[in-house]
Amino acid sequence: MAAMTAAAVPATGSFQKQDEEWRAVLSPEQFRVLRLKGTDKRGKGEFTKKFEEGTYSCAGCGTALYKSTTKFDSGCGWPAFFDAIPGAIKQTPEAGGRRMEITCAVCDGHLGHVFKGEGYSTPTDQRHCVNSVSLKFSSAGSSQ
């Protein structure tokens, strides 16, 4: 499925499937993270150290989530972004208020967490800590 542009983000929650349908289209690791709110192993993700120009999309539904221009090396062991494409993610506070869960606004797939106020020299001082397995990447020169 081709990645969607920010202007083409479908309505929130509009891409729903039953677990058996998700299992048929996702790898076991993608299902564990996206649907069961799992976490990649620290430092092992495909996109942790990737800084090529392009767009990161949801591995579940193809919705464009992050531009590479918002990616930075936080040293946390997971891909880190300081901002998402407008309307592409949902943020839900977790108990204790230290972090917010982030999910795809279209398919509700678990992406990771947002941490605020950690002192990064980024425009937002936010760290969107995202599981690599939740993402697909399209380089700026590709047709997707």
Curated annotation (Swiss-Prot):
The protein's Enzyme Commission number: 1.8.4.12
Cofactor(s) needed for function: Zn(2+)
SUPFAM superfamilies linked: Mss4-like
Residue span, MsrB domain: 19-140
Matching Pfam families: SelR
GO BP term, example: response to singlet oxygen
Name under which the protein is recorded: Peptide methionine sulfoxide reductase B7
Organism: Arabidopsis thaliana (Mouse-ear cress)
Gene behind this protein: MSRB7
